[in-house]
């Protein structure tokens, strides 16, 4: 295989990875939109959070396809892993900080698990896209950021299992 053909395959692979991330982001955003009304019924702050997550994830889909820069990919990883960690905290420790249900532990549900799996998939796909066609220095930095995110999620999962 010539180096030109190999380069085209790698570029196509990265593009496919970005399409996976964009599709999962759209899915997670639509799932958040689906449950936004019930969260507004609980408290305006919960509803506003879900509306913000919806907007961010739906808008992220075209952004990551049009401008797949390192900062855009890293922002997607950090943002989605933050939502995953908040989700796991609300299912183990309780809703943090604000609102009438602060401190209450939420139940796991089918729709929210689907959204969380989508968000983890986004982080993995974006991490893979970061590692393709990168310099050794930026690859190390990207791996470190992805590793910190995954260790953080792993730690929260550990807390979930320990709490149940």
Could you describe each region identified by the protein language model?
Residues 18-30, 147-152:
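Alpha-helical transmembrane segments
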Residues 24-39, 159:
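Membrane-embedded alpha-helical segments in integral membrane proteins
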């Amino acid at each position: 295989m010539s180096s030109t053909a190999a380069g085209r395959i790698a570029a196509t692979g990265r593009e496919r990875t970005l399409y996976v991330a964009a599709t999962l982001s759209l899915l997670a955003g639509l799932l958040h939109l689906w449950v936004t009304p019930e969260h507004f019924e609980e408290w305006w702050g919960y509803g506003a959070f879900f509306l913000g997550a919806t907007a961010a994830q739906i808008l992220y889909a075209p952004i990551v396809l049009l401008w797949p820069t390192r900062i855009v990919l890293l922002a997607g990883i950090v943002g989605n892993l933050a939502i995953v960690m908040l989700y796991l905290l609300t299912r183990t420790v309780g809703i943090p900080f604000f609102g009438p249900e602060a401190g209450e532990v939420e139940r796991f549900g089918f729709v929210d698990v689907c959204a969380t799996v989508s968000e983890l998939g986004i982080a993995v796909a974006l991490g893979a896209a970061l590692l393709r066609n990168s310099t050794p220095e930026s690859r190390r930095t990207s791996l470190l950021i992805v590793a910190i995110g995954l260790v953080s999620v792993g730690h929260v999962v550990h807390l979930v299992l320990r709490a149940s």
